[in-house]
């Protein structure tokens, strides 16, 4: 029920990469950040999996067309998923527009990059009529290197 079409591809992809049907998914994605001075997380980005320009079918096809031995169980990542709005950018580099526009947090702190002690929380879910399928959350804290 969450299958959908992705963005219009212009220029049109080569024939072997064209999709004639809904080939991606409506998956809500959020990035939250909490510094050591904060008790609650701030939402810093909200995007959607369907913003991927190249859907996973296209990525796998392109990846394997030259003979790459992709097998069951191999991990393949989509890369950064950014939406059309400023608050839907998918990486710190994009969110801060090349480190020139710091993210302002509710604590009064600013970030152009993650710092030691920062905790990042990723969330993903699909929303239906009267129900929600969550992918859980993925959380990590940056620790000092020494």
Tell where the protein language model's regions lie, with residue ranges.
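Catalytic-core "active-site belt" of small-molecule-metabolizing enzymes
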Residues: 1-71, 82-146
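Hydrophobic, well-ordered secondary-structure elements that form the walls
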Residues: 73-76
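Aromatic-rich peripheral "rim/lid" segments of glycoside hydrolase catalytic domains that contact
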Residues: 79
